[in-house]
Amino acid sequence: MKILVTGGAGFIGSHFVTSLISGDIATPQPVTQVTVVDKLGYGGNLRNLAEASADPRFSFVRGDICDEGLIEGLMARHDTVAHFAAETHVDRSVVASGPFVASNLVGTQVLLDAALRHHIGRFLHVSTDEVYGSIDTGSWAEGHPLAPNSPYAASKAGSDLLALAYHQTHGMDVVVTRCSNNYGPRQFPEKMIPLFVTRLLDGLDVPVYGDGRNIRDWLHVSDHCRGLALALGAGRAGEVYHIGGGWEATNLELTEILLEACGAPASRISFVTDRKGHDRRYSLDYSKIAGELGYRPRVDFTDGIAETVAWYRANRSWWT
Protein backbone atom coordinates (compact mmCIF):
# COMPACT_ATOMS: atom_id res chain seq x y z
CA MET A 1 0.00 0.00 0.00
CA LYS A 2 1.31 3.41 -1.02
CA ILE A 3 -0.68 5.88 1.04
CA LEU A 4 -0.90 9.66 0.79
CA VAL A 5 -1.84 11.22 4.13
CA THR A 6 -3.06 14.80 4.01
CA GLY A 7 -2.64 16.86 7.16
CA GLY A 8 -0.33 14.21 8.54
CA ALA A 9 1.71 16.63 10.65
CA GLY A 10 -1.33 17.56 12.72
CA PHE A 11 -2.61 15.91 15.87
CA ILE A 12 -4.71 13.00 14.61
CA GLY A 13 -2.91 12.62 11.30
CA SER A 14 0.51 12.29 12.92
CA HIS A 15 -0.73 9.63 15.32
CA PHE A 16 -2.20 7.73 12.37
CA VAL A 17 1.04 7.97 10.40
CA THR A 18 3.15 6.87 13.36
CA SER A 19 0.83 3.92 13.95
CA LEU A 20 1.01 2.94 10.26
CA ILE A 21 4.80 3.03 10.24
CA SER A 22 5.15 1.15 13.53
CA GLY A 23 2.58 -1.50 12.63
CA ASP A 24 0.47 -0.69 15.69
CA ILE A 25 -2.62 -0.67 13.48
CA ALA A 26 -3.51 -3.31 10.92
CA THR A 27 -3.65 -2.47 7.21
CA PRO A 28 -5.21 -4.39 4.31
CA GLN A 29 -1.84 -4.70 2.54
CA PRO A 30 1.75 -4.17 3.68
CA VAL A 31 2.65 -0.47 3.86
CA THR A 32 5.44 0.26 1.39
CA GLN A 33 5.18 4.05 1.19
CA VAL A 34 3.73 6.75 3.46
CA THR A 35 3.78 10.31 2.15
CA VAL A 36 2.55 13.18 4.29
CA VAL A 37 1.47 16.41 2.63
CA ASP A 38 0.89 19.25 5.08
CA LYS A 39 1.15 23.03 4.75
CA LEU A 40 2.40 23.26 8.36
CA GLY A 41 -0.10 25.84 9.52
CA TYR A 42 -0.34 26.62 13.21
CA GLY A 43 -1.66 23.11 13.99
CA GLY A 44 0.97 21.20 12.03
CA ASN A 45 4.35 20.38 13.53
CA LEU A 46 7.15 18.31 12.05
CA ARG A 47 8.16 17.24 15.55
CA ASN A 48 4.95 15.21 15.60
CA LEU A 49 6.49 13.02 12.89
CA ALA A 50 9.91 12.52 14.47
CA GLU A 51 9.40 8.80 15.04
CA ALA A 52 7.93 8.15 11.58
CA SER A 53 10.59 10.18 9.78
CA ALA A 54 13.29 7.67 10.70
CA ASP A 55 11.62 5.01 8.55
CA PRO A 56 12.74 4.76 4.88
CA ARG A 57 9.13 4.31 3.76
CA PHE A 58 8.24 7.79 5.01
CA SER A 59 8.48 11.08 3.14
CA PHE A 60 7.17 14.57 3.80
CA VAL A 61 6.02 17.24 1.36
CA ARG A 62 5.19 20.73 2.53
CA GLY A 63 2.24 22.04 0.56
CA ASP A 64 -1.42 23.01 0.43
CA ILE A 65 -4.11 20.55 -0.63
CA CYS A 66 -5.65 23.37 -2.70
CA ASP A 67 -2.54 23.36 -4.93
CA GLU A 68 -3.82 21.36 -7.91
CA GLY A 69 -0.42 20.85 -9.52
CA LEU A 70 1.14 19.57 -6.33
CA ILE A 71 -1.73 17.20 -5.59
CA GLU A 72 -1.78 15.91 -9.16
CA GLY A 73 1.87 14.91 -8.95
CA LEU A 74 1.50 13.29 -5.53
CA MET A 75 -1.62 11.36 -6.40
CA ALA A 76 0.10 9.73 -9.38
CA ARG A 77 2.51 7.96 -7.02
CA HIS A 78 -0.01 6.50 -4.56
CA ASP A 79 -2.89 4.03 -4.48
CA THR A 80 -4.61 5.07 -1.24
CA VAL A 81 -5.54 8.38 0.41
CA ALA A 82 -6.24 9.18 4.07
CA HIS A 83 -7.58 12.73 4.17
CA PHE A 84 -7.09 14.52 7.51
CA ALA A 85 -6.15 18.02 6.33
CA ALA A 86 -8.66 20.56 7.60
CA GLU A 87 -9.19 23.79 9.46
CA THR A 88 -10.87 22.48 12.61
CA HIS A 89 -11.40 25.14 15.29
CA VAL A 90 -15.00 26.29 15.75
CA ASP A 91 -14.06 29.61 17.39
CA ARG A 92 -11.77 30.56 14.50
CA SER A 93 -14.49 29.68 11.98
CA VAL A 94 -16.92 32.04 13.71
CA VAL A 95 -14.46 34.92 13.27
CA ALA A 96 -13.40 34.09 9.69
CA SER A 97 -15.01 31.29 7.68
CA GLY A 98 -13.06 31.74 4.43
CA PRO A 99 -10.08 29.53 5.32
CA PHE A 100 -12.47 26.77 6.41
CA VAL A 101 -14.35 26.77 3.12
CA ALA A 102 -11.08 26.87 1.17
CA SER A 103 -9.34 24.04 3.00
CA ASN A 104 -12.21 21.81 4.02
CA LEU A 105 -14.40 22.05 0.94
CA VAL A 106 -12.27 23.25 -1.99
CA GLY A 107 -9.23 21.28 -0.80
CA THR A 108 -11.32 18.13 -0.60
CA GLN A 109 -12.62 18.73 -4.13
CA VAL A 110 -9.05 19.09 -5.44
CA LEU A 111 -8.10 15.80 -3.80
CA LEU A 112 -11.17 13.96 -5.04
CA ASP A 113 -10.67 15.13 -8.62
CA ALA A 114 -7.03 14.04 -8.62
CA ALA A 115 -7.89 10.72 -6.96
CA LEU A 116 -10.53 10.09 -9.60
CA ARG A 117 -8.13 10.78 -12.46
CA HIS A 118 -5.52 8.43 -11.01
CA HIS A 119 -7.92 5.63 -10.07
CA ILE A 120 -7.05 5.67 -6.37
CA GLY A 121 -8.06 2.42 -4.72
CA ARG A 122 -9.51 3.84 -1.51
CA PHE A 123 -10.17 7.39 -0.31
CA LEU A 124 -10.67 7.63 3.46
CA HIS A 125 -12.32 10.93 4.36
CA VAL A 126 -11.97 11.82 8.04
CA SER A 127 -14.75 13.97 9.50
CA THR A 128 -16.50 14.97 12.71
CA ASP A 129 -19.67 14.51 14.75
CA GLU A 130 -20.19 18.28 14.61
CA VAL A 131 -21.83 17.97 11.19
CA TYR A 132 -25.03 16.82 12.95
CA GLY A 133 -25.50 19.90 15.11
CA SER A 134 -26.75 19.20 18.62
CA ILE A 135 -28.77 16.36 20.17
CA ASP A 136 -30.56 16.55 23.52
CA THR A 137 -30.99 12.82 24.15
CA GLY A 138 -29.92 9.59 22.48
CA SER A 139 -27.17 9.26 19.90
CA TRP A 140 -26.86 9.93 16.18
CA ALA A 141 -26.79 7.02 13.77
CA GLU A 142 -24.98 7.44 10.45
CA GLY A 143 -28.20 8.16 8.56
CA HIS A 144 -29.20 11.13 10.71
CA PRO A 145 -29.73 14.37 8.74
CA LEU A 146 -26.85 16.82 8.82
CA ALA A 147 -27.59 20.11 10.61
CA PRO A 148 -24.29 21.94 11.23
CA ASN A 149 -24.42 25.03 13.43
CA SER A 150 -20.97 26.57 12.91
CA PRO A 151 -19.08 27.54 9.75
CA TYR A 152 -16.50 24.86 10.59
CA ALA A 153 -19.15 22.15 10.90
CA ALA A 154 -20.86 23.34 7.72
CA SER A 155 -17.61 23.16 5.77
CA LYS A 156 -17.01 19.61 7.00
CA ALA A 157 -20.59 18.59 6.21
CA GLY A 158 -20.11 19.92 2.69
CA SER A 159 -16.89 17.98 2.26
CA ASP A 160 -18.55 14.78 3.52
CA LEU A 161 -21.37 15.13 1.02
CA LEU A 162 -18.94 15.89 -1.79
CA ALA A 163 -16.87 12.80 -1.01
CA LEU A 164 -19.98 10.61 -0.92
CA ALA A 165 -21.20 12.17 -4.17
CA TYR A 166 -18.00 11.05 -5.91
CA HIS A 167 -18.87 7.51 -4.88
CA GLN A 168 -22.44 7.82 -6.14
CA THR A 169 -21.54 9.61 -9.38
CA HIS A 170 -18.23 8.02 -10.31
CA GLY A 171 -18.20 4.77 -8.35
CA MET A 172 -15.15 6.00 -6.45
CA ASP A 173 -14.07 3.91 -3.45
CA VAL A 174 -14.81 6.46 -0.72
CA VAL A 175 -15.34 5.79 2.99
CA VAL A 176 -16.29 8.59 5.41
CA THR A 177 -15.66 8.44 9.15
CA ARG A 178 -17.07 10.78 11.79
CA CYS A 179 -15.51 10.87 15.23
CA SER A 180 -16.18 12.15 18.73
CA ASN A 181 -13.97 14.77 20.39
CA ASN A 182 -10.38 13.52 20.36
CA TYR A 183 -7.75 13.95 23.05
CA GLY A 184 -4.22 12.73 23.72
CA PRO A 185 -0.57 13.79 23.41
CA ARG A 186 0.48 16.33 20.76
CA GLN A 187 -2.89 18.06 20.42
CA PHE A 188 -2.50 21.77 19.66
CA PRO A 189 -3.53 23.85 22.69
CA GLU A 190 -6.55 25.53 21.15
CA LYS A 191 -8.81 22.55 21.89
CA MET A 192 -10.31 22.21 25.34
CA ILE A 193 -8.21 19.50 26.98
CA PRO A 194 -4.74 20.68 25.90
CA LEU A 195 -5.73 24.32 26.41
CA PHE A 196 -6.87 23.67 29.95
CA VAL A 197 -3.95 21.38 30.81
CA THR A 198 -1.31 23.82 29.56
CA ARG A 199 -2.96 26.77 31.29
CA LEU A 200 -3.22 24.86 34.56
CA LEU A 201 0.43 23.81 34.32
CA ASP A 202 1.29 27.49 33.84
CA GLY A 203 -0.73 28.49 36.91
CA LEU A 204 -3.47 30.22 34.91
CA ASP A 205 -7.26 30.13 35.09
CA VAL A 206 -9.28 28.05 32.61
CA PRO A 207 -12.22 29.59 30.68
CA VAL A 208 -15.43 27.55 30.84
CA TYR A 209 -18.08 28.64 28.34
CA GLY A 210 -21.57 29.51 29.61
CA ASP A 211 -22.84 27.28 32.41
CA GLY A 212 -20.36 24.50 31.63
CA ARG A 213 -23.10 21.98 30.98
CA ASN A 214 -22.41 21.35 27.30
CA ILE A 215 -21.79 17.62 26.87
CA ARG A 216 -19.15 15.91 24.74
CA ASP A 217 -18.13 12.31 24.12
CA TRP A 218 -14.36 11.85 24.42
CA LEU A 219 -12.22 9.57 22.25
CA HIS A 220 -8.54 8.83 22.79
CA VAL A 221 -6.59 9.43 19.60
CA SER A 222 -5.17 5.88 19.61
CA ASP A 223 -8.70 4.44 19.62
CA HIS A 224 -9.60 6.78 16.78
CA CYS A 225 -6.62 5.55 14.76
CA ARG A 226 -7.65 1.94 15.27
CA GLY A 227 -11.14 2.76 14.06
CA LEU A 228 -9.75 4.56 11.04
CA ALA A 229 -7.58 1.56 10.16
CA LEU A 230 -10.61 -0.71 10.33
CA ALA A 231 -12.61 1.59 8.05
CA LEU A 232 -9.67 1.90 5.66
CA GLY A 233 -9.16 -1.82 5.45
CA ALA A 234 -12.66 -3.27 5.56
CA GLY A 235 -15.24 -0.49 5.44
CA ARG A 236 -17.81 -0.68 2.66
CA ALA A 237 -17.39 1.83 -0.16
CA GLY A 238 -19.87 4.70 -0.02
CA GLU A 239 -20.56 4.19 3.69
CA VAL A 240 -20.21 6.42 6.75
CA TYR A 241 -18.82 4.99 10.00
CA HIS A 242 -18.97 6.60 13.43
CA ILE A 243 -15.95 6.26 15.71
CA GLY A 244 -16.97 7.05 19.28
CA GLY A 245 -15.22 7.03 22.61
CA GLY A 246 -18.09 5.98 24.86
CA TRP A 247 -17.28 8.48 27.63
CA GLU A 248 -19.61 11.48 27.98
CA ALA A 249 -19.19 14.37 30.40
CA THR A 250 -20.24 17.97 30.76
CA ASN A 251 -17.51 20.51 30.18
CA LEU A 252 -17.65 21.38 33.87
CA GLU A 253 -17.21 17.73 34.88
CA LEU A 254 -14.27 17.44 32.52
CA THR A 255 -12.76 20.63 33.93
CA GLU A 256 -12.95 19.22 37.46
CA ILE A 257 -11.16 16.06 36.29
CA LEU A 258 -8.42 18.15 34.68
CA LEU A 259 -8.05 20.29 37.81
CA GLU A 260 -7.49 17.16 39.88
CA ALA A 261 -5.07 15.66 37.35
CA CYS A 262 -3.02 18.87 37.34
CA GLY A 263 -3.22 19.43 41.10
CA ALA A 264 -5.07 22.73 40.74
CA PRO A 265 -7.88 24.20 42.89
CA ALA A 266 -11.47 24.85 41.76
CA SER A 267 -10.79 28.58 42.08
CA ARG A 268 -8.95 28.35 38.75
CA ILE A 269 -12.28 28.00 36.90
CA SER A 270 -13.39 31.20 35.16
CA PHE A 271 -16.86 31.16 33.60
CA VAL A 272 -16.95 33.21 30.39
CA THR A 273 -19.62 34.26 27.90
CA ASP A 274 -20.78 31.33 25.79
CA ARG A 275 -19.58 31.24 22.19
CA LYS A 276 -21.91 31.71 19.25
CA GLY A 277 -23.51 28.56 17.88
CA HIS A 278 -22.29 26.44 20.78
CA ASP A 279 -23.83 22.98 20.37
CA ARG A 280 -25.27 21.65 23.62
CA ARG A 281 -24.50 17.95 23.24
CA TYR A 282 -22.82 15.52 20.85
CA SER A 283 -23.28 11.76 20.97
CA LEU A 284 -22.44 9.17 18.32
CA ASP A 285 -23.95 5.71 17.99
CA TYR A 286 -20.97 3.63 16.87
CA SER A 287 -22.74 0.26 16.79
CA LYS A 288 -22.29 0.05 13.01
CA ILE A 289 -18.49 -0.03 13.06
CA ALA A 290 -18.61 -2.24 16.16
CA GLY A 291 -20.89 -4.76 14.46
CA GLU A 292 -19.33 -4.73 11.00
CA LEU A 293 -15.65 -4.20 11.77
CA GLY A 294 -15.23 -5.14 15.43
CA TYR A 295 -14.32 -1.68 16.74
CA ARG A 296 -14.33 -1.02 20.48
CA PRO A 297 -12.65 1.85 22.32
CA ARG A 298 -9.93 0.47 24.59
CA VAL A 299 -8.45 3.42 26.46
CA ASP A 300 -10.01 4.11 29.85
CA PHE A 301 -10.66 7.85 30.11
CA THR A 302 -8.96 8.21 33.49
CA ASP A 303 -5.84 6.48 32.16
CA GLY A 304 -5.95 8.50 28.96
CA ILE A 305 -6.13 11.80 30.82
CA ALA A 306 -3.27 10.79 33.12
CA GLU A 307 -1.14 9.92 30.08
CA THR A 308 -2.07 13.18 28.36
CA VAL A 309 -1.28 15.40 31.36
CA ALA A 310 2.01 13.56 31.88
CA TRP A 311 2.96 14.18 28.25
CA TYR A 312 2.33 17.93 28.47
CA ARG A 313 4.29 18.09 31.73
CA ALA A 314 7.24 16.32 30.13
CA ASN A 315 7.13 18.20 26.82
CA ARG A 316 6.79 21.85 27.77
CA SER A 317 9.10 22.88 24.92
CA TRP A 318 6.57 21.48 22.44
CA TRP A 319 3.78 23.84 23.51
CA THR A 320 5.56 26.94 24.83
Swiss-Prot record:
GO biological process, one term: nucleotide-sugar metabolic process
Keyword NAD: yes
Lineage: superkingdom: Bacteria
InterPro entries: dTDP_Gluc_deHydtase, NAD(P)-bd_dom, NAD(P)-bd_dom_sf
Sites where the protein binds NAD(+): 11-12, 38-41, 64-65, 84-88, 103, 152-156, 182
Record-linked Gene3D superfamilies: NAD(P)-binding Rossmann-like Domain, UDP-galactose 4-epimerase, domain 1
Pfam family for this entry, one: GDP_Man_Dehyd
Required cofactor(s): NAD(+)
Cofactor: binding details: Binds 1 NAD(+) per subunit.
Record carries keyword Transmembrane: no
Reaction(s) this enzyme catalyzes, per UniProt: dTDP-alpha-D-glucose = dTDP-4-dehydro-6-deoxy-alpha-D-glucose + H2O
Function field: Probably involved in the biosynthesis of the acarviose moiety of the alpha-glucosidase inhibitor acarbose. Catalyzes the dehydration of dTDP-D-glucose to form dTDP-6-deoxy-D-xylo-4-hexulose via a three-step process involving oxidation, dehydration and reduction.
Quaternary data: Homodimer.
Protein name stated in the entry: dTDP-glucose 4,6-dehydratase
Species this chain originates from: Actinoplanes sp. (strain ATCC 31044 / CBS 674.73 / SE50/110)
